[in-house]
Amino acid sequence: SFIRNATNKSGWQIFPEFVITQGVKSLPALEVFQTYFGCGKIFINKRYDNHHEHLYRFCVRSIDDLSKKIIPFFKRYRLRTAKQKDFLVFAKIVRLMERKQHYTPRGMRRIANLVGTMNRKKRSRFLESPETIRRSPAKRDKI
């Protein structure tokens, strides 16, 4: 995720987020994930629309936990859904962040472009930001 952060030099903060969302009936499954991996938190997403149950999210944001626990697990036990492609992109983003690429303008653009290839409903605000457009790489720079 990209969020505005005035305290960062770039004005943006990037944080990877692995999320599994389930209804209340599957909350015990999320608790099993949390116990098995020994990391992450479970949050409630209260819904006030026409759905009758709230959703729960198992969320892991620590780069260390992602790179040492979550990614190795899902590389060994591959997803058998369309999410596998997104997972591979996510793993690449985490690797870039481990190498501190997200601290450079070029690295941030590269990560933003990778995020744009994932199953998303809308374009990243980072890519639409006037600051990002002004700092776009020259044609010779490849992202």
Over which residues does each language-model region extend?
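Internal intein/HINT superfamily modules and their associated LAGLIDADG
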Residues: S1-I143
